[in-house]
Amino acid sequence: PKDMVVHPSAGHYSGTLVNAVMYHCGDELSGINGVVRPGIVHRIDKDTTGSLIICKTDAAHIHIAEQIKNHSCNRRYRGIVVGNVTEDHGTVTGAIGRDPKDRKKMAINEKNGKPAVTHYTVLERFGNYTYMEFALETGRTHQIRVHMASIGHPLLGDEVYGGRHVSGKWHLQGQTLHAMHLGFIHPTTGEFLEINAELPEYFEKILAELRRK
C-alpha cells in the first residue's frame, strides 16, 4: 500500500513490509540480505503501490535475483505523468546515481551512475496528463521517477523530482505509480507465474476524473 516502507531504516523502524512479513512468516524467510531485509529480493518506493516478490528460502532468493539480473523477470508499472507525452512508445537510458547536490535524491549521472533502461508505452492522453505503462530492464533506485522527470514528464504527485506544482488539484502525497505486473519462473516448479495487482482506489479515481474531461 501507499506510504509503506519495504524495510526498517532511519525514521522507519516499525510498520514496514518486513515487519508484517516477519510477523506472518517468522523465521521462514531468506537470509541473504541479512536481518534487516529478510526475504526481500527487490524493492518499491514508499509511495509506490503494487506487488513485489518475497522469498522464503535462500535458493528461491538466488533464483529470483538471477531472473531480475538477466531480465527474464517481467516488471511492469502503471503511472500518470505530467504533460502530453507525444511518442506512443519510447526508451529512456540515462545512467542513474546519487544527486551530488542532494544525497537523498537520485539523478541522471552519466559519469558515476549505473546504467538504467526504462521502456514506456502511452495508454491514454488527457491534455496535460498522460497515463503510461513502464517496463524495466534495470532496477535502479527511483528509476522511473528520475527517468520521466529527466525528459520533462515527472510523475503526478512526485514533488521530489517534479516540484510542488506536480500534485495538481489532487494534493497527492507522493508519486502516482503502481507496480502492476510481475512475471517470473517459480524457483521450484519451473512454472511461469504472472501476478497482476489491481490499481489502488485513489489511482482509479484520478483516472475516472481525467476521463470525464
Tell where the protein language model's regions lie, with residue ranges.
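Residues that recognize and position ribonucleotide moieties
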Residues: H42, H89-G90, G113, H142, ...
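Thr-Gly-centered strand-to-loop micro-motif
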Residues: H7-P8, C55, M106-I108, M132, ...
